[in-house]
Amino acid sequence: MSINTLRIGTRESKLALWQAQQVKDSLETKSISPQLIPIKSDGDINLTKPIYSMGIKGVFTKALDIALLENRIDIAVHSLKDVPTQLPQGLILGAVIQRGSARDVLVYNEKPNLNAPATIATGSLRRKAQWLNRYSTHTIEGIRGNINTRLKKLDKSKRWNGAIFSAAGLGRIGLTPENSVNSVSYTHLTLPTKA
């Protein structure tokens, strides 16, 4: 019996690698030997500009999609919420993995009084709108980076009373958090491949 290597493209963040490892573990058999291929995305390189203002479709997926089209990888692991509604020509969604928790959570160093003015960090327009709808006296500031980077920024910040994170993302890197509207496809992982 011959063993086939399956090259799995993934972003380099701890969360992305964890997600890709779960896919790798589920695909490993006696005849398939998956290997992870980390690839840096535009969204991981530029950590200052808000994602919505970057003007790039698939800011976290484009580099992996190009690697698929160039046959450098066989499948990619994306968070489905990051995938553009129209895939690049030649790619299809090969699978969608079972959804994780769809909740958002507030992470803080000291529990803030949510009835008083506060400054909350998030890079998501959806989270910003949702939070300000409920807490109109609060101010929202932008934050960029992977989960670990954002947690470090929150820890060092003297301005922020807290930051909003994905419960599933925190859980996937080993941090388990304890009311929100979620974006379409939030917490779904998808595996694009060549058509």
What is each model feature region?
Residues 80-81, 89-137:
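A conserved helix-loop-strand patch within extracytoplasmic ligand-binding domains
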Residues 187-193:
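Conserved small/polar residues in nucleotide/adenosyl-binding loops
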Residues 18-19, 85-86, 130-131, 150-153, ...:
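Phosphate- and divalent-cation-binding pockets in alpha/beta enzyme and binding domains
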Residues 36-38, 138-146:
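Short beta-strand-to-loop elements that line the ligand-binding cleft
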Residues 68, 154-155:
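Hydrophobic residues within well-ordered alpha-helices
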Residues 1-81, 88-91, 195:
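N-terminal hydrophobic or amphipathic helices and topogenic motifs
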Residues 98-102, 143-148, 169:
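Short, acidic/turn-prone active-site loops that include or flank metal/cofactor-
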Residues 81-87, 155, 160-179:
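A ligand-binding cleft/hinge motif common to bilobed small-molecule-binding domains
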